[in-house]
Amino acid sequence: MKQNHSWKGWFSSVRAWGCSVQEKRSYNTLRFPMTNRLILLLYPLFIVCMAELNQDKYPSKLVLFISEHPTIMLFNVLIAALIFTGLLLLFRSGWFSMLVESVIYMALSITELFKYNTNGNHLIMTDMKLARSLKSLTSFAYIKITPRLILYLAICLGFILLAFWFNPRLRKRTKLRKRLLPGLACLICCVMVVTVPAVSRPVYALFRLDTKEADNTFILNEKFENNGFLAFFMQTGSENLSNQLDEPADYAEDSDNAIRQYLASDVAETNFKNGVKPNVIEIMSESFADFRVFSKELEELGYTGLDSYYAGLDKAASMGTEGKFIVPTYASYTVRTEFEMLFGLPVKSLNDPNMPQRMLLDRQQPTIPSYYKSWGYTTAYVHPFQSSFYSRKRIYSNFRFDTMIFEDDFTVPVTTYGEYIDDNVVYDQIESLIASSSEPLYLHATTMQNHQPYSDGDSDDEFLNYLSRIQHSADGLAEMLEHLSEANEPTIVLFIGDHFPSLRGDNGIYNQLNITSENCSDLYEQHYILWNNFNMDISDMPRYRDIMHLVAHVLFQYRHA
């Protein structure tokens, strides 16, 4: 009974304190009108500065940016003011409106900070599509809570607490239905700046935003330097929306069986050279790149003996043929290279989306696997990671794969190397599927072992840790090819890397190599190895091509013209 009275007394005390605070806040609203107006007027400038400061890190850099780009800063403040006005009209409460906008701005700012520090790519609106894969993304990211970040968040919280205490708010007791329309109008104006080209183009021109087209990551990063975080986020959002495919005026839906007309329903054995249907294995190795293209520059930085890390790759190349091809991405967006391999179609033809596979969700597609399927092949997709990432299981099920194997589906013993499933496990799974298939096998594998982060390893240098993983992967590849050489089944193996790795932002190896938009072409070229065990004529294989042309060449290489 005493305890019950104690709880009641405690609750009464808290309630009395809350009432006292509320009375004081109501008094402050009336007592300090000028202070409250100043808080309301300063807030848009404050939150813009905090969001940008979180990227610039030091106040001096923010001041320099404002002095060099005053019109862009004005644009940011006006957008923040429109959002704040809209929220204020909807909620009336100044501090609560500030809380909502601050959470949005600082959440985006922190996400941008972590993303750039992770892979050197800046946050864009289309990245929001990956929000459902937050768990996967956090496993990649270099998330470091620094004292500076804590300080900036504390300053934001302090401003909101100040507003809570002085309690600025709309004085007039206007009913919500009368505030709703102007409040929504303010928010809709902000949305229109991003989504409506007729609005965004003159607005961006007026405030002198950098709107040049960016066909590689380094040009995009230069736009970030010119626009700052907030203007960059909005302008690239507008750009991505304007690049969406428009349905032609005379477009008509295909019939249910339309795709079949492009695919032969039955291909006679005589259509294949010597009547042989070989297994076709595509291995797209995550972040596998040959840094020997920068050997001279790396030696000057103290990185020597690169050949030892690539001995397995050189051995595999000596067993087949090798060349270079152009990939559509750098440091991230594996699905762009994967899309070109699975469709034989350049992402540029779809206006260069970051996640092209999401544009083809509604039906079966005429993919490379579907061609093999029509020729009597068994088809398989192997990816040793979560099936939900990039919605692969849901989307790729339309690509005519008979079997899809993700991290929980392996039928061979699973081990890890670094953070992820060992590439040798993938190689073992490939050999197992070849052995168990009664039909010729087409298989596409996208590995995971060499994905970031590279902070864990024998060295404090993430680049050396990356090279150690590459060495392990390349040695395993050479060993697998030796196994397949001894097998009786005719087999083709195409080994490629999807893109150069994500090696931090400001202090990564790319900055040390002084890579810019003018000299970054090597980062969009990848090595390929084509191997077979049945003396296929590969004398006319291209040594330098786009990835989709390379896949098409392999597709028809062993068939009669």
Please annotate each region the language model reported.
Residues 54-66, 93, 225-255, 266, ...:
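Alpha-helix capping and helix-coil boundary motifs
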Residues 57-58, 93, 124, 146, ...:
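Helix N-terminus capping/helix-initiation residues
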Residues 119, 127-140, 147-151, 236, ...:
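Short alpha-helical interface patches
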Residues 119, 125-128, 220-228, 232-234, ...:
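Membrane-interface micro-motifs in multi-pass membrane enzymes
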Residues 128-131, 226-229, 238, 256, ...:
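Alpha-helix initiation and N-capping motif
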Residues 197-282:
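Membrane-interface segments at or immediately adjacent to transmembrane helices
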Residues 265-274, 278, 282-285, 290-561:
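Solvent-exposed soluble domains appended to multi-pass membrane proteins
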